[in-house]
Amino acid sequence: MLAYPVSKKPINYKDKIFMQPKLDGVRCVIQCDNDVITAYSRTGKEWKNIEHIKMELRAFFDKYPKVILDGELYNHDLRDNFEKIISLVRKQKPTEEQRLEASNLTQFHCYDVISLAGVKVECKFEDRIEFVNESLMLLDYIHIVDTYSVGSALEAKILHQKNLALGYEGSILRTNDSYACKRSHNLRKFKDFSDKEATIVGYLDGKGKREGTLGKFIMQDDEGVEFGCPPGKGYNYKDLANMLSNIHDYIGQRATFTYFERTKAGSYRHPLFKTLRNYE
């Protein structure tokens, strides 16, 4: 289920509303097919370098083989290094060394279930998250995302600020409705920065102390707006130097960037390159 920005539609806090921290991880749906546990991205790409996670979920799927878990591959200690998680989980033929590194750094954080087939519970969110909390064991690699009930816009704002202070990228507001396998107003993003995709069409070298590294990408959005977009958090001097050395691997690629807001003229305030959009 994809989320709309919270600003798109007013929230009725007289209804049951729940809030979770928004993770800056990699979407992961895990299910069991014919006794084989598989994990997928939101576009259906299989994640193959998370055997440690699937092993820990074996007992759960032995008991609930028809349940589909929804969450993210994430590690809060790597919250400023999104690229590291991607580089680990996207391996299609991981070496033993890469499997070991993934087992040390990659966790599954569950925030919902897509299907509760065969389980006698209702489909409202409060019932789904209650099932998760009661049925999913907390192990080394399995985490349950904290979920709180909020009763007002002020309460939501206070909790959102707490999530930001804890290092999360924002918050998610959920209505107490059934799961929707599409972008839905049942799920709202509550964050200060927005994500968007654009195409890398050029670049500028770094200057001064950043000489010999990438200064910024030149990107073009789907409306034809061009803008400079320097790499954001998580990229060190060595990373920026490697980007410049391999710049032709980036030109023409779709990429995700973050920005604070758009001006009346349509330009982006504080755009930052996040990652290439080639991992799903």
What do these predicted ranges mean?
Residues 2-9, 87-96, 150-157:
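Short, motif-level signal for alpha-helix interfacial/capping segments enriched in acidic residues
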Residues 2-3, 8-15, 198-203:
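Short Pro/Gly-enriched beta-strand edge/turn motifs at strand-loop
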Residues 11-138, 279:
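Covalent nucleotidyltransferase
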Residues 18-20, 26-71, 180-280:
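Classical nucleotidyltransferase
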Residues 71-73, 110-117, 146-149, 175-177, ...:
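Short, structured patches in soluble enzyme cores that scaffold and shape functional sites
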